[in-house]
């Protein structure tokens, strides 16, 4: 694969399944800027990991303190590796005490639907 996004097109073109991950966090108002910065750094680092097709964070339009994550991974092994990376562990640890709540991580298997 030449890159995360190019790899995603390759996987879909050949009909491979992928792993989708969603989740959200609600930042405290007084820590939002620091939490957002940490989220953006985490996303940028994660995008360079093997098997990462996409990794994004978005601000919720209805509640700007909520940050929503959407990730696509080539397979479960890539996701397990991502969770085991020291940077991922440090990110989760950093968030503790800076957020009000989390929706938890939801993980799905997805496959392309033929057109």
Which role fits each region the language model picked out?
Residues 10, 15, 57-65, 92-115:
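Glycine-rich beta-strand-turn "strand-cap" elements at beta-sheet edges
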Residues 45-53, 72-106:
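An amphipathic, aromatic/His-enriched active-site/gating alpha helix that lines ligand/cofactor pockets
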Residues 26, 58, 70-72:
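Short hydrophobic/aromatic beta-strand micro-patches
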Residues 43-68:
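Short, glycine- and small/hydrophobic-rich beta-strand elements in well-ordered beta-sheets
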Residues 23, 35, 39, 55, ...:
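Hydrophobic pocket/interface hotspot
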Residues 27-35:
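Short, surface-exposed ligand-recognition loops at beta-strand->loop->(often short) alpha-helix junctions
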Residues 1-17:
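N-terminal amphipathic/basic-hydrophobic helices that include classical n-h-c signal peptides
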Residues 19-25:
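Active-site-flanking beta-strand signature of metal-NTP-handling nucleotidyl enzymes
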